[in-house]
A protein has these predicted regions:
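Flexible loop/turn connectors
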Residues: 13-123
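Short beta-strand elements in bilobed, periplasmic/extracellular small-molecule ligand-binding domains
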Residues: 1-10
């Protein structure tokens, strides 16, 4: 199930099917950032559901208070220091090798901080 959220932190109750329609409800939500994930918390509880028993929630970017929220948020941690270092190295290389510095593809591995907003899916 894909949810499109217009505002960076807004996730509304009407986007989730009610508890009685469990077959049509997602078992997990992977939000594109932690603020949207935390916005999901309110919508989920307003539906009478619990995290992570009914729905697991995962964010992306590990904002400062994600681990201190009422239900610590499982989130993907970007290697921001490494991103900065690699970006600076690429920029220096391009400056020192104009005008046709080669294109570089760089893949950095994120980390998953598993906290208490996720659990094993109880349904098939």
């Amino acid at each position: 199930v894909l949810f499109v959220v217009r505002f960076f932190h807004r996730f509304e109750q009407r986007q989730l099917p009610p508890r009685k329609k469990a077959d049509h409800r997602p078992t997990a939500i992977f939000a594109y950032n932690d603020l949207v994930a935390l916005g999901c918390y309110r919508a989920i509880t307003e539906c009478g559901l619990t995290i992570p028993t009914d729905i697991s929630v995962v964010g992306f970017d590990d904002i400062a208070f994600a681990e201190y929220y009422q239900q610590p948020l499982t989130t993907v941690i970007q290697p921001t220091v490494e991103i900065g270092i690699k970006a600076a190295e690429i920029l220096i290389h391009k400056i020192q090798n104009p005008p046709f510095a080669e294109q570089k593809k760089l893949v950095l591995k994120p980390l998953l901080a598993v906290r208490s907003s996720t659990s094993i899916c109880p349904r098939k």
